[in-house]
């Protein structure tokens, strides 16, 4: 609880660092001739990252190869979390897949070596199933860094029973994409570049499918968050005011996973209707056309305690949020950048810092100043992107 007369200030990034990032972004847009934060309609921009030797379509002409040793292992998520916390004072968190049941049930042969779906292509599908079908017909698919290393495409590929090829992954920060099977992905890429295209054997394919199913579902990722942060209690508030109207991938996936794991224990401060299966609105207006995350939760999870987002900035709305926070054992902040002022207001109103678990889910990494502030405070932070190329 804030001391009498004191004013709590939630950790924030340096203005100078933020300004520098904006300048770099503007320079990139100028060079690309596009106002988008990442190249859109420019598949050539991303395809150039993959060796021309791997742009092979027909799988029938290729030999089979065992890419991974029989005893290949990846670090446990909780061990990676502890190592990251020791280094930066925060835990790594990545996108997750809300519907793991979509993983193909068999390792059938496929006609294509590399998927023809390339990052940067304009999105032209009206059906997610149609979009994923091309991945289902291929053994490998290109997936690159965009604004950050973490993209939903990696997961769409993996849960299609396909292996993503991620150029330059070996140069990324050790905690970027911490939850993906990075060692296996880098091993596969190295062998393809050194020995040429080949079809992965059943062991290799099964490893990636099993890893994704066990560790990359939204429920599995939520279990990691609960364990790493030590979340306990019968009432856990999920705070993200903007999510009710605008998608933030990491916040949405985390909320989905927590509700899949803990059910009605999770109380959204502001209900996110498009995540519930009785939503009747147009999901295609949402980010990514709503593919993969809309209408995935049973409507029975709708919380009667959630507040009206339209009233959030009124005096009455702020009082209601404080009352809800006081009634909860833990507060998970799904989009810290978008809710930082609300966090400050709640702490200054008497909610203990230690009750907050905050998620930094944007492409913008926390700078040294922010990390130092986080280390000094009592809130727990999860971070999606880390320093590096």
Identify what each model region corresponds to.
Residues 115-119, 123-242, 249-262, 266-272, ...:
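Catalytic binding pocket for nucleotide-activated donors in carbohydrate/polymer assembly enzymes
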Residues 98-102, 125-126, 138, 220-224, ...:
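A Trp-anchored, charged/polar loop motif used as the substrate-binding/catalytic surface
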Residues 62, 107-109, 136-138, 160, ...:
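Residue-level preference for short coil/turn positions at secondary-structure junctions
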Residues 1, 21, 28-79, 247-389:
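Extended catalytic core of nucleotide-activated donor transferases of GT-like folds
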Residues 18-117, 179-192, 199-205, 209, ...:
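N-terminal accessory regions of S-adenosyl-L-methionine
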């Amino acid at each position: 609880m804030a001391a009498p007369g004191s004013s709590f200030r939630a950790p924030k990034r340096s203005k100078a660092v933020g300004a520098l990032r904006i300048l770099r972004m503007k320079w990139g847009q100028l060079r690309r001739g596009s106002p988008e934060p990442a190249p859109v309609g420019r598949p050539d921009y991303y395809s150039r990252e993959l060796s021309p030797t791997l742009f092979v379509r027909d799988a029938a002409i290729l030999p089979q190869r065992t890419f991974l040793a029989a005893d290949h292992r990846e670090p446990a998520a909780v061990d990676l979390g502890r190592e990251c916390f020791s280094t930066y004072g925060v835990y790594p968190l990545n996108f997750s897949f809300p519907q793991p049941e979509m993983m193909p049930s068999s390792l059938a042969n496929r006609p294509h070596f590399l998927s023809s779906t390339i990052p940067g292509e304009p999105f032209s599908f009206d059906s997610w199933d149609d979009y994923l079908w091309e991945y289902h017909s291929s053994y490998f698919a290109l997936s690159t860094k965009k604004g950050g290393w973490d993209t939903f495409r990696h997961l769409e590929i993996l849960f299609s029973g396909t292996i993503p090829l991620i150029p330059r992954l070996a140069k990324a920060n050790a905690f970027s994409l911490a939850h993906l099977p990075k060692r296996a992905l880098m091993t596969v890429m190295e062998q393809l570049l050194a020995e040429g295209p080949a079809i992965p054997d059943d062991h290799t394919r099964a490893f990636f499918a099993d890893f994704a199913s066990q560790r990359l579902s939204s429920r599995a990722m939520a279990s990691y968050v609960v364990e790493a942060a030590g979340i306990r209690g019968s009432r856990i508030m999920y705070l993200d005011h903007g999510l009710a109207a605008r998608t933030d991938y990491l916040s949405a996936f985390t909320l989905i996973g927590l509700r899949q794991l803990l059910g009605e224990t999770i109380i959204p401060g502001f209900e996110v209707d498009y995540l519930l299966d009785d939503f009747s609105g147009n999901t295609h207006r949402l980010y990514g056309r709503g593919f993969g995350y809309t209408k995935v939760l049973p409507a029975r999870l709708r919380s009667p305690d959630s507040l009206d987002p339209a009233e959030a900035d009124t005096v009455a709305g702020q009082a209601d949020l404080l009352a809800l926070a006081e009634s909860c054992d833990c507060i998970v902040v799904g989009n810290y950048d978008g809710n930082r002022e609300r966090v400050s207001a709640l702490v200054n109103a008497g909610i203990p810092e230690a009750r907050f678990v905050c998620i930094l889910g944007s492409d913008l990494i926390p700078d040294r100043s922010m990390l130092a502030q986080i280390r000094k405070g009592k809130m727990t932070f999860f971070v999606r992107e880390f320093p590096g190329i």
